[in-house]
């Protein structure tokens, strides 16, 4: 009996086991942070990664998020004891406003919201367009702060993590 097929199978099994043990930890959107594409009018724009975390990162953020989500309510600046609870509707409101404006049809923009903080990521054609987009987002109900991670054009390194 030839032992080569058996030894090849054993080597393959060991290699697959090692690969499984060294694989990167799973990353997912543990907190269900809303993330949506508002426009897709600028070809070649680097696509941002949605808010993904490893389980360890999620555990590290859980206490901070609970504290941060309650602190604005205690300070009287949030209408809800959990500032994250209304993020989906806030995110949807910002996306709808961007789409309704029609002046941003030539941009590629994604919107994410975490505790009333709105993140704008993607590409615009000019600094004036970027400023107008930030102002539009800031004017929406439920938005406390806008973090502008937009780039003018599509060239260069984006100020956000790119999806793989």
Each model region followed by its residue ranges:
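N-terminal targeting leaders
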Residues: 2-15, 21-164
């Amino acid at each position: 009996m030839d032992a080569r097929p058996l030894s090849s199978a054993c080597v393959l099994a060991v290699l697959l086991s090692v690969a499984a043990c060294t694989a990167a930890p799973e990353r997912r959107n543990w907190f269900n942070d809303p993330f949506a594409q508002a426009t897709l009018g600028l070809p070649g724009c680097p696509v941002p990664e949605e808010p993904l975390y490893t389980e360890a990162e999620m555990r590290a953020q859980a206490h901070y998020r609970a504290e941060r989500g309650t602190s604005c309510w205690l300070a009287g600046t949030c209408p809800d004891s959990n500032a994250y609870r209304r993020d989906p509707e806030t995110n949807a409101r910002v996306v709808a406003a961007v789409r309704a404006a029609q002046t941003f049809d030539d941009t590629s923009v994604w919107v994410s919201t975490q505790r009333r903080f709105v993140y704008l990521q993607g590409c615009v054609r000019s600094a004036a367009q970027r400023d107008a987009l930030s102002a539009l987002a800031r004017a929406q109900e439920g938005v406390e702060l806008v973090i502008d991670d937009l780039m003018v054009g599509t060239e260069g390194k984006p100020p956000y993590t790119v999806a793989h």
